[in-house]
């Protein structure tokens, strides 16, 4: 379990996160939903140790964390395949099978990041994250720039990992439809300090959700608007 208690984070005395608490268990997905600059990405960086907190506690009982940044952050001197393999206990056959599902050919996997489009790099980074053997995954806007069909395939792969292997996920998104599709709990935040506006709990199993479910939740909870305004 990940347990965050009364967390405070500052940059040059500017309070980014103030008194924030959260618990995340195996197989759960919790989504941080709020405007840009409210501290969502900072929280992910604190969880994985890239930033130092001012006060509070972060207790992580998971064995391995993987972080899918907004930027793809592939190693430039390795092929797409090697970028995945170097962090993954999965066999090459599993990598090939999942890559084919998301439109990456064997030829694509043997290319260096600079030879791939931005979308291909994003898909490679996604595979690297979910095949890393992690039991806690941090996702920062993982589907931005992907078309609707491709987004759906990636979500199906992620949901399978969550439900079959108990992967825990902390997700940052501005997209209400993504939040409705993937979250057990949507944590809606105030514009400053990661203040809690409200929590929306969703009980429907992830694998039972579809676009109609997304639309219903968005309409009921957010008035039908897709992006945080």
Walk through the language-model features, giving the residues of each.
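Hydrophobic anchor residue at the start of the ABC signature
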Residues: 126
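Catalytic Walker B motif of ABC-type/P-loop ATPase nucleotide-binding domains
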Residues: 137-141
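Helix-to-loop junction immediately C-terminal to a conserved catalytic motif
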Residues: 48
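Conserved ABC ATPase signature
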Residues: 112-116, 120
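The feature captures the beta-strand-to-loop junction immediately N-terminal to the Walker
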Residues: 33-35
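Conserved ABC ATPase "signature" region
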Residues: 92-108, 160
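Conserved beta-strand-loop-alpha-helix hinge in the C-terminal portion
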Residues: 191-221
């Amino acid at each position: 379990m990940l347990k965050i208690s009364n967390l405070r984070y500052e940059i040059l005395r500017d309070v980014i996160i103030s008194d924030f608490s959260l618990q995340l268990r195996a197989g759960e997905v919790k989504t941080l939903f709020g405007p840009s600059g409210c501290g969502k990405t900072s929280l992910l960086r604190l969880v994985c140790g890239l930033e130092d907190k001012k006060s509070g506690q972060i207790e992580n009982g998971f064995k391995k964390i993987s972080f899918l940044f907004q930027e793809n952050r592939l190693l430039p001197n390795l092929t797409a395949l090697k970028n995945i393999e170097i962090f993954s206990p999965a066999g090459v056959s599993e990598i090939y099978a999942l890559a084919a599902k998301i439109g990456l050919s064997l030829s694509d996997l043997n290319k260096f990041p600079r030879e791939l489009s931005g979308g291909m790099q994003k898909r490679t980074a996604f595979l690297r994250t979910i095949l890393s053997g992690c039991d806690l995954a941090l996702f920062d806007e993982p589907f931005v720039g992907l078309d609707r069909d491709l987004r759906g395939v990636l979500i199906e792969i992620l949901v399978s990992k969550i439900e079959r292997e108990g992967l825990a996920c902390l997700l940052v998104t501005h997209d209400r439809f993504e939040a409705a599709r993937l979250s057990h709990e949507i944590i809606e935040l105030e514009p400053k300090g990661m203040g809690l506006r409200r929590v929306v709990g969703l009980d429907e199993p992830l694998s039972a959700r579809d676009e109609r479910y997304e639309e219903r939740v968005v309409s009921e909870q957010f008035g039908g608007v897709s992006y945080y305004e």
